[in-house]
A protein has these predicted regions:
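Short amphipathic beta-strand and strand-loop transition segments with alternating hydrophobic
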Residues: 65, 156-167
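N-terminal strand-loop-strand
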Residues: 194-237
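Conserved hydrophobic/aromatic beta-strand scaffold that supports enzyme active sites
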Residues: 38-39, 61-63, 173-175, 216, ...
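A short, polar/proline- and glycine-enriched secondary-structure boundary/capping micro-motif
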Residues: 48, 58-61, 86-88, 215, ...
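Short histidine-centered catalytic/ligand-binding loop motif
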Residues: 32-40, 235-245
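Unchanged
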Residues: 190-191, 200-203, 238-309
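Glycine-aromatic micro-motifs
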Residues: 2-155
């Protein structure tokens, strides 16, 4: 209620955008002030959930004094644990609200769904992946429908009865109980579907038009191995996940350099789409990458921290 929220000002602090994402950090700064809200009458579970969300991002909860319309009072506030977390750009709540709030809300929702579960610590480690899933969902939900996309509107015709977050690791696994329309305008009963929550990826075939040669990489793949393939080292185009806030074409160029040690001079988009829509949300952006292979020597590349070889 309105009685549980009030405005407050903290002296000798200022709020900046964080370096690591679209969120605020409060930094000591003499003769400045920061505006905020006080939340009163929080329950113990409320505080535990707030601590789970904030403390995992290198914040600390500490007592401090703030000014309100009723005078000075003592509160607990979340402060960043390192001064190097902040950029030099002053925080704007209105900019955050218009540009980032929808993504942050969805990411926080997924993140907090893992509170109190065996995946609680994993969620903090994998938060950028959670952010990326939220970014993709917001982008897809707001994108205009093309002339080639048929079928009823998703939001008005597909009813989600229950969403269960079954697993979180490098990817996530959800179970969705839902109803959806048939082409004869009838509606299905409640169906349970298990879905691998993948991400977006750029797939690039490096090509030298002068030599008329392509470049492939060979690497171990868990899919063939778990299928029983005796030779799970496969030849394939360069591919890699698109990071949060990264453009597909930038990811394509980055991946070619990381996995093959060569620069792309030009990208030609082939198409984009779902490689396996019945099992995963993964979405590929497919490119031809123009390269110069005249002096290229095969070698061992990849990011070792990611287990690439």
């Amino acid at each position: 209620s309105s009685d549980d929220i009030c405005r407050a000002t903290i002296k000798d602090f200022r709020v900046y955008w964080a370096k690591e994402g679209p969120f605020p950090v409060m930094i000591p700064e003499p003769n400045s002030e920061a505006l905020g809200l006080i939340l009163k009458n929080l329950s113990e579970p409320d505080v535990e959930r707030l601590n789970y969300y904030e403390l995992g991002f290198d914040y600390v909860l500490a007592p401090t004094y703030v000014e309100t319309h009723a005078g000075q009072i003592e509160v607990s506030a979340y402060f960043c644990n390192r001064s190097d977390m902040a950029t030099t750009k002053l925080w704007s709540f209105n900019d955050w609200l218009s540009d980032h709030s929808e993504i942050q809300y969805l990411a926080a929702q997924e993140f907090l769904d893992f509170f109190g579960t065996k995946f609680g610590d994993t969620a903090q480690v994998m938060y950028n992946s959670i952010l990326k899933r939220a970014e993709v969902f917001v982008s897809e939900s707001s994108a205009p429908t093309s002339a080639l996309e048929f079928g009823p509107d998703m939001k008005t015709n597909i009813q989600v009865e229950e969403l269960k977050r079954e697993y979180l690791g490098f990817f996530a696994l959800n179970q969705v109980d839902l109803k959806y329309p048939f082409f004869d305008n009838s509606t299905s009963g409640v169906k349970s579907r298990t879905i691998l929550m993948g991400s977006e990826a750029s797939l690039i075939l490096p090509y030298d038009p002068i030599l008329d040669k392509v470049l492939l990489v060979e690497q171990f793949r868990i899919g063939p191995f778990c299928r029983g393939d005796k030779a799970p080292w496969v030849y394939e185009p360069v591919a890699g996940l698109i990071e949060f806030g990264e453009k597909p074409e930038d990811a394509a160029k980055r991946e070619v350099f990381e996995e093959a040690g060569i620069q792309v001079t030009n990208l030609v988009k082939i198409n984009s789409g779902y490689p396996n829509p019945g099992e995963a949300t993964t979405y590929f952006y497919n490119y031809i990458g123009i390269v110069d292979l005249s002096d290229y020597s095969p070698g061992i590349y990849g990011v070792r921290d990611e287990g690439e070889d």
